[in-house]
A protein has these predicted regions:
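Gly/Ser/Thr-rich loops at beta-strand to alpha-helix junctions
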Residues: 7-13, 90-104, 186-197, 217-219, ...
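Short, glycine-/small-residue-rich phosphate/pyrophosphate-handling segment
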Residues: 112-114, 118-167, 287-291, 302-318
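Glycine-rich phosphate/diphosphate-binding loop of Rossmann-like nucleotide-binding domains
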Residues: 11-20, 30, 34-46, 180-218, ...
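N-terminal glycine-rich anion-binding loop in soluble enzyme alpha/beta folds
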Residues: 5-70, 121-129, 141-162, 167
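C-terminal non-catalytic interaction/assembly regions of soluble proteins
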Residues: 3, 10-16, 21-24, 28-29, ...
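A conserved active-site cap/scaffold subdomain adjacent to cofactor or substrate pockets
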Residues: 209-272
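Short, acidic/small-residue loops that bind anionic groups at enzyme active sites
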Residues: 91, 103-132, 141, 212-216, ...
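Short Gly/Thr/Asp-enriched flexible loops that form oxyanion-binding sites at enzyme active sites
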Residues: 94-113, 197-201, 345-351, 359
């Protein structure tokens, strides 16, 4: 069963077309109206009044557009949760522009990971992080605005209907990847720390863990923090802090204030390193204020800037402040011979003074805390270091006091 979620006053014809397309494929459809202006142009299964009541507001009281979008998003989220709990939602599809994209994706993000969610939007180009957040939501660019059925929109919407029909059928049949019973470990990685994290992942897998690797792209860090906060992880191997240095320099791909603190607050055992704190990430170019710095083109979409000694010291203080309150067993590994593939002897970002400022700030900031510091005379990508970190996390997770809890 597929839920069609949207504003049936402004996009009624498009939703009616999608409903008929899905029904022609034998798909049962629930049409949910989130409009607040004119009368719906197609009869919904869940009217806007029911959505408004789910948000705790009186139907017809929403005159301000911004307040209406916020309230209806809240109500739609409750409706989607209920339909999913009742077994009447195996996938959800929405179409629209900026307003409906904001409303519908907010509601979709209330559903668990694994439930098919598809948004066809004229906004699905550029920075889509406000819509996706830390969910598994899928975005499809509409090419033309969602305003009537024409030869372009018909093909795009047909593809969307066929896609959600297939995803919903798979979800309803119970064909997702089987859930395992191995403990989940969250690890962080970027291209410049891949070799070391891969070695740690292989070792943890051999030790009986299922490892979820989060790309340190901003969205990846938010997902990592959310899963840690939700109690989904048994422990973390947080080897890559690119999002932290990127936030410090105002770059592209920030993970938010919970990036370092979520696992601490959740009381998770952690083994941590400082991979990629030698750089901050930007887009295809860097701001004018940084163009005199050591800039490296990673690929056509990503440019990085080397962090200075002063910035590394500030980053060390920030990381130490976030970790200081850890009550669960926590270990911090300092790779004295480099923080990334670029920051190694002979590498373009090799800077012992800057790295030393980072290490000194961490040592000072964590003095007297429960965080154990281990120093390694190698770089962060050394497979031996990755395996040592994995073994250390395994020891923390299987310690008698932990195993008994």
């Amino acid at each position: 069963m597929v839920v069609l979620l949207g504003t049936l006053d402004t996009k009624g014809a498009e939703y009616g077309w999608l409903r008929d397309r899905l029904r022609a494929r034998g798909v049962r459809v629930v049409l949910v109206d989130t409009g607040t202006l004119d009368a719906p142009r197609v009869v919904p299964d869940v009217p806007r009044e029911e959505v408004a009541r789910a948000a705790g507001v009186m139907p017809g009281a929403l005159r301000d557009r911004g307040a209406a979008v916020t309230a209806m998003a809240r109500g739609a989220a409750e409706v989607l949760r209920r339909l999913h709990a009742e077994g009447r939602l195996h996938g959800v599809l929405s179409v629209g522009g900026s307003g409906n994209s904001a409303l519908s994706t907010t509601a979709m993000r209330a559903l668990p990971v694994g439930v098919p969610k598809l948004m066809v939007s004229s906004m699905a180009s550029g920075d889509v992080s406000p819509y996706v957040g830390d969910s598994d939501l899928t975005l499809m660019y509409s090419v033309v605005d969602v305003a009537g059925i024409n030869r372009i929109s018909a093909r795009v919407l047909a593809n969307a209907a066929d896609a959600i029909a297939g995803m919903a059928a798979g979800y309803a049949a119970g064909r997702p990847v089987p859930r395992g019973d191995r403990p989940l470990v969250g690890a962080t990685m970027a291209g410049v720390t891949t070799r070391g994290v891969d070695a740690a992942r292989d070792r943890l897998t051999a030790l009986g863990y299922e490892v979820l690797v989060f790309h340190a792209s901003g969205a990846g860090g938010r997902s990592f923090a959310a899963m840690a906060a939700d109690g989904a992880l048994a422990g973390t191997l947080d080897a890559t802090m690119l999002e932290v240095s990127t936030a410090h320099l105002g770059g592209v791909g920030r993970a938010g204030p919970e990036r370092l603190t979520a696992a601490v607050r959740a009381g998770l055992p952690q083994v941590i390193s400082v991979g990629a704190l030698d750089m901050a990430k930007f887009g295809p170019s860097v701001p004018n204020r940084l163009r005199h710095r050591r800039v490296h083109v990673h690929n056509a979409s990503v440019t990085v800037v080397r962090t200075t000694a002063a910035e590394c010291a500030a980053l060390g203080r920030s990381v130490a402040a976030a970790l200081r309150g850890a009550t669960a067993p926590t270990a911090l590994y300092l790779p004295l011979r480099g923080l990334s593939t670029l920051d190694v002897p002979g590498g373009v970002y090799w800077d012992p003074a800057a790295d030393g400022a980072l290490f000194d700030a961490l040592r000072s900031g964590l003095e007297g805390s429960r965080v154990e510091i281990r120093e390694a005379d190698t770089d962060v990508n050394d497979p031996e270091l990755g395996r040592a970190m994995a073994d250390h996390l395994h020891a923390l997770l299987t310690a008698p006091a932990r195993a008994a809890s």
